[in-house]
Amino acid sequence: MGPKAKKSGSKKKKVTKAERLKLLQEEEDRRLKEEEEARLKYEKEEMERLEIQRIEKEKWNRLEAKDLERRNEELEELYLLERCFPEAEKLKQETRMLSQWKHYIQCDGSPDPSIAQEMNTFISLWKEKTNETFEEVIEKSKVVLNLIEKLKFILLETPLCDLQDKNIIQYQESILQLQELLHLKFNVATEILLRQASTLADLDSGNMEKVIKDENVTLYVWANLKKNPRHRSVRFSETQIGFEIPRILATSDIAVRLLHTHYDHVSALHPVSTPSKEHTSSATELVKDDVENVEKAISKEVEEESKQQEKQSHLIQEEKLKVEEEQDDIEVKMGSAEEESEAIKCELEMKVLSETVSAAQLLLVENSSEKPDFFENDMVDLFQFTTLGGVYHLDILELPPQCKPVKGWMIVEILKEGLQKYTYPPETTEDFETENAFPPIEVTLEVHENVIFFENPMVVRWDAEGKHWRTDGISNVSYKPNERLITFSLDTFGPVTLIQDAHINMPYQSWELRPLDVNKVLLTVTTVFTEIQIQIKENLCMLSSVKLKDKKHISILEGTWMTPIPFIIALKEAGLNIFPTRYSHFYVVINNKVPLVEVKAYRQMALLSSTFAFGWSKWNLLCNSTKVVFKVREHLPEECTENPNWALLMFSGDRAQRLKIKEESEAFSEALKEETEFHSTLYHMVRDFASKEAMEKVRSSNCQFVNSVCHMLLSTRLLSYS
């Protein structure tokens, strides 16, 4: 046998301990090398980051230093531009005085609502007048409603520093007296009308039906003369307005009245906000002291010069001609001193007026720290809801004795107690067998055509004892929006009204303020339900358009120019409320900003509004309460508005900066845009990228226009309620 063949392949070589240690050492060296490289890379990156941060900080500090260096200069220039606000207020004061003078020389017999004696005389004389028909009362009501409106505007438009507490009480008492007397006159006129019910009876039904319509009041009255138990459905001719009355009323000597007043004289008057006047009064006292000091200094200087000249004239009698010439010089000096005194007084008066205006503007954006008094479940909180479309006074009345013809005369028994209400249901029901003898009365009303309800209206009734609106005692409410008819069942008759959430259009989804022409802008506010466009020019505002769910709504207010405060009231009464109150933040989730920052932003936006467009930015939600962010661009008539070139500005009240981010960016950053600087005002911020023509237009803006734009911005509070 030959030798054995060797196995193919050899055994795996065994790794020695030394080799294993060597491998581990190599692995460790590689790991350490990688760690060292990573450390060096991190240190390098960190050094680069710190270097960039240092450079940025140095740049930031340089920009801050530059901003501080020119701050006083910029603020002085802003102060001169903002003189338009006290100038506009001065024009308002002159307009009010001119209005009083025009009323005085007009001599039309109507009283001056601001003079208590004239108002008391007017009320007393009208009280003494008797036997007025409904048509006569309606005609007189136009004068009365105008007086009430004037008194309300006095309370709203007069600066609080010019309103004394006794004046506020006087005006509010006059309003209440006029409201009560007007309603009393309507009741007396209704009684006179019902005395003639038998002569006005319908030939078919035998009952009396009367409808009297006016711009402010509509009367529907039905007298049950036949007492037919089957005649239980009352519908006024050519309308769907009416009642479904129970059998007991159909067989009673009663009349049913629906008096629809297109105004609300039932709800309590809103209290006039009277902030602490310490700031304004202290400023006033300071200015008065300055004026007195200036006058004393000037008069002392003139007196010393006069004494010195008199002494010289006694010593040198022979130089009489020279003395006379010097006396002329003194007279010139005295004249120039008086002119200087007047100029200083005027400047100081403007200063205190500016302080007053600023305090009033700040009041418009201040939030109340305390929520209104607690309301029961069935009570209506009029800080949360608002009445719309006026008040429907529903009354069941006892039919008064009817006129009877006797030998060519009309004889009527006049009850001493006057018009009496029929109690339904009666206070005691023991004499009646069935439980449902007094069911609720079904009522169908027409909603006022000039009012917008974004949701189905709520029906509420007036509680005369508690002096508030309530939701109980009303059932089976149904609303037909196309016909504008609302039907409901009412346990007891009395005043009813329709209410809507006052903040239904808050918060806003977006807004834009855009120039239209010289001293004319368009403010657009977009909400969940509507888009409202308002034009502003000089001291006037106008509703330009209202869009509801992609369709245009025609409002009676469109095309009517009004001053800001009456305009705001008119929009609220039409259901277009985009004007928060100091209590609104309790009912709306808002992006609350510091009041002083808001005021400064609105004032400076108004100054620039004749040339620059402003718009809503989503980043305003992400910055804190001490800063506001919005879009801005110079408005060029020929530019394409599809893709406007907006700049993002952030403003803290003391500093304005242009942000690096855009509206489409993914995250918020306060980083400064390259090659831009800090400024103390919005005016100087936009001047960096605006044309000379634009800035010239800003400087020549009409003071009343700027003031009106500012008032509208303060009233809508776009930066907090968007």
Curated annotation (Swiss-Prot):
Record's comment on post-translational modification: Ubiquitinated. Ubiquitination leads to its degradation through the 26S proteasome. Ubiquitin-proteasome-mediated DNAI7 degradation occurs in mitosis.
Query: Where are the compositionally biased (Basic residues) regions?
Result: 1-15
UniProt subunit comment? Part of the multisubunit axonemal dynein complex formed at least of two heavy chains and a number of intermediate and light chains. Associates with tubulin. Interacts with microtubule.
GO cellular component labels: axonemal dynein complex; cilium
Q: Does the keyword Cytoplasm apply?
A: yes
**Positions of region (Disordered):** 1-20
Give the subcellular location. Answer: Cell projection, Cilium; Cytoplasm
- What GO annotations for molecular function exist for this entry? beta-tubulin binding; microtubule binding
Question: Main localization of the protein?
Answer: other
Gene name in the database record: DNAI7
Q: Which UniProt keywords apply?
A: Cell projection, Cytoplasm, Ubl conjugation
Q: Which family does it belong to?
A: Belongs to the DNAI7 family.
Q: What does this protein do?
A: Via its association with the multisubunit axonemal dynein complex, is potentially involved in the regulation of cilia function. May act as a cell cycle regulator.
UniProt source species: Macaca fascicularis
Q: Which domain of life is it from?
A: Eukaryota
A single Pfam family it belongs to is: Casc1_C
For this entry, the protein name equals Dynein axonemal intermediate chain 7
